[in-house]
């Protein structure tokens, strides 16, 4: 791709977004996907896979703070964390901020993504790949959760959209495997798209997860990069109390963890579980 051109996202057929490409840092098709990292004056470094924006330097903190601190602080004493995907390292960066976590395992299908991001998105991973608690496994996520002998307190599925390599991370086989290696009282969370535009994806995840977990729901965050604005995250556990903890409990845990965030705070934590009526109606109708 030439510099000083427009890059168009291909996620939706009838509408979408574009970015001015100021400088192409890397563009290559790996064994699994078409990866590009380029610079944009407004959003900094942008990474896209198969024509779909995955992350930008400017607003990645919103996504990664909400995907990590919500389940980890709701759990309260997570020792072992599993990240599925997350090759850019930003999810790992946020998990490493929790000093009580003892082991962090990341399963990434494409070793190339990890090496590219270490070089081209250093602000995302911020040295977290060198954390002594971290183990990288190059494997398919579905295979890992169905074969591993390890168990985890929190599982974070930092998946792409349900197309291409990411499609398997929205299947019953994956959700069943996650339940299999989740400790009692553990929490599973996953990226679930922009619900206003991808509602079927959320409904499908809810239906499948409900076969394996007694408490299944969603929480949300406003992330500008993802077209449509409001990103939905799947939430699944067998402890329904964890979704309804008091603000005092979350505040105490937040303070004890010594976290200083740019988006997440205890009030946002509670508010994130308030869902729009159209989603409530759709869930009730299925």
From Swiss-Prot:
Pfam families in alphabetical order: Spermine_synt_N, Spermine_synth
PROSITE patterns attached to this UniProt entry: PABS_1, PABS_2
Catalytic residues identified in the record: 158 (proton acceptor)
CDD domains: AdoMet_MTases
Catalytic activity, as annotated: S-adenosyl 3-(methylsulfanyl)propylamine + putrescine = S-methyl-5'-thioadenosine + spermidine + H(+)
Record's function text: Catalyzes the irreversible transfer of a propylamine group from the amino donor S-adenosylmethioninamine (decarboxy-AdoMet) to putrescine (1,4-diaminobutane) to yield spermidine.
Protein name (Swiss-Prot/TrEMBL): Polyamine aminopropyltransferase
Gene: speE
